[in-house]
């Protein structure tokens, strides 16, 4: 806390560090080979979240002003875990009788960052009249390295590149960016006895600034074979998404 004895200019510097380790609840899935077992195993947990913050304000007789900035960092130290398939000794391309992956790899939450800056005011007038406003802008980013399409070493892309190789990917990392803007205004007053007036306005905008990645194929059918994917107007990335961009 800065200036703890000065109520006119209060300021606070904060730091939050949260480390979680151990295991989450049981998780897992199917390993698609000639035998399709389903596994439930404890999901490893090892993540670190840090938040750096700064808040300051200016108080005066007719109201106050305030501003803040926060920087949040999330680091997942257990990004993947692998399950062996006891019914499949080696990797192979799936056929009607044999084949499939000898292992399954599960990808957990990637590292990501967020920055938020905000400022606001509150003004006081006669007849219990109050006027306030807040503005907050944020930037969310995620640029963790991609993992290969599959862990199955036997699958090839149409160009002959091994699908478990990083060179088969359209790019090496996501380079994701999202901008947010929040605007909030409030007004209240009691101009005469028995009459109260209140009004408010709130606006929120989220803009995805991530560049489009075209994916023309994958091994989404559980690591068994390469599948060609054709982008369409509804699935511009080659996969169904929550929104049409």
Q: What is each residue range found by the language model?
A:
Residues 1, 54-58, 119-123, 185-189, ...:
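Residues on the lipid-exposed face of transmembrane beta-strands in outer-membrane beta-barrel proteins
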Residues 4-6, 49, 60-63, 126-128, ...:
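Outer-membrane beta-barrel channels and translocator barrels
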Residues 24-40, 77-107, 143-173, 209-238:
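Solvent-exposed loop segments that connect transmembrane elements
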Residues 120-134, 138, 175, 188:
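Long, internal scaffold/assembly segments composed of regular secondary structure
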Residues 11-17, 58, 67-71, 133-139, ...:
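Transmembrane beta-barrel strands of outer-membrane/channel proteins
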Residues 1-12, 108, 112, 126, ...:
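Extended N-terminal export/anchoring regions of large proteins
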Residues 48-52, 59, 111-117, 177-183, ...:
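Residues that define the transmembrane beta-barrel architecture of outer-membrane proteins
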Residues 1-60, 69-71:
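Post-signal-peptide, soluble extracytosolic/periplasmic N-terminal scaffold domains
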């Amino acid at each position: 806390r800065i200036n703890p004895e000065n109520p006119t200019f209060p300021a606070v510097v904060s730091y939050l560090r949260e480390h979680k380790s151990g295991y989450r609840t049981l998780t897992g899935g199917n390993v698609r080979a000639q035998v399709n077992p389903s596994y439930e195993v404890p999901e490893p947990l090892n993540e670190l979240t840090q938040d750096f913050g700064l808040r300051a304000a200016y108080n005066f007789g007719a109201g106050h002003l305030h501003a803040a900035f926060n920087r949040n960092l999330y680091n997942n130290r257990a990004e993947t875990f692998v399950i062996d398939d006891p019914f499949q000794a080696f990797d192979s391309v799936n056929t009607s009788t044999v084949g499939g992956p000898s292992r399954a790899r599960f990808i957990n939450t990637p590292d990501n960052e967020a920055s938020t800056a905000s400022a606001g005011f509150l003004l006081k007038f006669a007849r219990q009249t109050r006027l306030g406003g807040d503005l907050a802008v944020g930037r969310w980013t995620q640029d963790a390295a991609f993992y290969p399409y599959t862990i199955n070493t036997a699958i090839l892309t149409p160009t002959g590149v091994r699908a478990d190789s990083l060179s088969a990917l359209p790019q090496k990392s996501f380079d994701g960016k999202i901008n947010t803007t929040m605007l909030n205004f409030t007004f209240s007053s009691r101009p005469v006895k028995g009459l109260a007036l209140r009004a408010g306005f709130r606006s929120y905008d989220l803009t995805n600034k991530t560049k489009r990645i075209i994916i023309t194929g994958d091994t989404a059918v559980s690591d068994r074979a390469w599948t060609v994917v054709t982008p369409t107007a509804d699935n511009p990335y080659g996969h169904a998404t929550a929104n049409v961009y």
